[in-house]
UniProtKB/Swiss-Prot annotation:
Protein name: Sperm-tail PG-rich repeat-containing protein 2
A Pfam short name: SHIPPO-rpt
Keyword annotations of the record: Repeat
STPGR repeats: 21-30, 63-73, 119-148, 157-203, 213-243, 257-268, 351-377, 400-410, 433-443
Species of provenance: Homo sapiens (Human)
């Protein structure tokens, strides 16, 4: 209404139709738009585009109704290639987090995830919609997936019912000289043969520091504060009226170890084996170690009567006959000898390995402290000097029975078995060689000896 542009009425001027009426004949030719002078519709000078898209070549682009004779090339129909446009998201989701691959033609191909993936994160979760909610919440043991029983780890702490709230306080007595860790170890440590060498070397290297100053009880000072310095105490001030040494150093007692004072390095198996091998006696003949005596020595020794020879009077009178077999004291009889075959081993001060009573010694040393009796003669003297209950004088030795106190038992004589023989073991050897009295000196030697003796007397 307010437009001053010219109106074009030429579209309606066509009076007749064309010869061939078709789709392309309806296009009305448009006039070229000329620049209008300040006559802008709606006060705007911008170019207006038409709502209809007009192709440059209408006949070539789209065939009309008269183009029914289609060529052979147009009859071959090709399937159109469909290319899906892949949109790259800004936030990667579950299946689009592995990136994309761009081809040469500009197409984008999505990279697929690997077969197994152990990564975790907010973009890697794959929700399972096909599984029920009850199975997702169940956290027990699936019997189809488990290969064995589940083993619970053992904890060192106490359990729910093992707490002792009320604790009894016990007084602990600790020995300063012995460490607390060493008091519980009552097992003896015996090193091996190859460990002794190392222990001996350590003992030589790390020697204990010995102080030069003597102990409190080792001073022998005769002077006192009440007496002058020049005067010395005599025998009257010595206790018990004796000036002998009270405690002598005995090597025997030092070598004997106590219940808990074994020196493993000195009293080892090697040293004991060496001492046994050095003191081992030679093997005797026929497995016997009885000392053998000659007949001459035996006759001289048996000249005086012994304790068993006083019963000969009863045998000679025929009053009583003993049951003993004759010649029983003969050392040379094969079967009737009662002489001891082995030497009597003297009593050793050191006890045997099996004579230790570990339970008793532990109770006396750790639990109940009792008085231990002395084990040697020197220890008995030391203990007896301070005990008031010891006897001062020796007991009176009672004499033996007199001559009239004997009551001989008369028994019948037992017959001597026939197979027992009193044959001597070593018979007297007969000398076959002639003695000095069997030789006769010739007459010429006798005359020469007489002349020599006469000449010696004259001189």
């Amino acid at each position: 209404m307010y437009d001053r542009a010219p109106r074009l009425l030429k579209l309606a001027e066509g009076g007749s139709t064309e010869a061939h009426v078709g789709p392309g004949s309806y296009q009305v030719p448009f006039l070229k738009q000329q620049a209008t002078g300040s006559n802008a519709p709606f006060l705007s000078l911008t170019a207006r585009e038409s709502t209809f898209t007009i192709a440059s070549s209408i006949e070539k682009a789209v065939p009309g109704p008269g183009h029914y004779n289609v060529s052979e090339a147009q009859k071959i129909s090709r399937s159109p290639t469909l290319t899906r446009s892949v949109d790259v998201p800004s936030i990667p989701s579950c299946g689009k987090s592995y990136g994309y691959h761009i081809n040469d033609d500009g197409s984008i191909i999505k990279c697929f995830p690997p077969a197994c993936d152990s990564t975790l994160g907010p973009a890697y979760y794959k929700p399972q919609f096909d599984v029920s909610n009850a199975t997702l919440k169940y956290k027990g043991i699936h019997f189809g997936n488990s290969s064995g029983r589940q083993e619970l780890p053992k904890k060192s702490g106490p359990g729910p019912g093992q707490y002792d709230i009320v604790q009894k306080k016990t007084s602990y007595y600790e020995n300063v000289n012995i460490k607390r860790d060493q008091q519980q170890n009552y097992c003896s440590f015996i090193p091996r043969l190859y460990e002794i060498i190392v222990l001996q070397e350590k003992k030589k290297r790390f020697l204990p520091m010995k102080s030069i100053t003597p102990a409190p009880g080792t001073y022998n000072e005769p002077r006192t504060a009440l007496k002058s310095l020049k005067k010395t105490s005599g025998l009257k001030n010595i206790p018990f009226g004796q000036s002998a040494v009270r405690f002598t150093q005995d090597i025997r007692t030092e070598e004997m170890p106590g219940p808990g004072f074994y020196n493993v390095l000195n009293n080892t198996i090697i040293a004991s084996v060496r001492n046994i091998c050095s003191k081992k006696q030679k093997k005797s003949a026929f497995g016997s170690s009885v000392p053998r005596t000659f007949f001459s020595v035996q006759k001289e020794a048996c000249a005086t009567p012994g304790p068993a020879d006083y019963q000969e009077f009863w045998h000679s009178q025929g009053v009583g006959i003993s049951d003993e077999l004759p010649n029983l004291t003969n050392k040379y009889a094969a079967f009737l000898s009662r002489a001891k075959r082995t030497m009597k081993v003297p009593d050793m001060v050191i006890p045997a390995p099996g004579s230790y009573d570990v339970h008793k010694s532990y109770e006396m040393s750790q639990v109940k402290h009792k008085y231990m009796p002395p084990r040697s003669l020197v220890a008995k003297r030391k203990h007896a000097s301070f005990l008031s209950a010891t006897p001062r004088c020796l007991e009176k030795v009672t004499d033996g029975p007199g001559p009239a106190a004997y009551n001989p038992v008369l028994r019948k004589s037992c017959p001597i078995p026939l197979f027992v023989k009193a044959s001597k073991r070593f018979e007297e050897s007969k000398e076959i060689t002639p003695g000095p009295a069997t030789y006769e000196i010739s007459q010429e030697k006798k005359k020469g000896n007489l002349i020599g003796e006469m000449a010696a007397d004259i001189m």
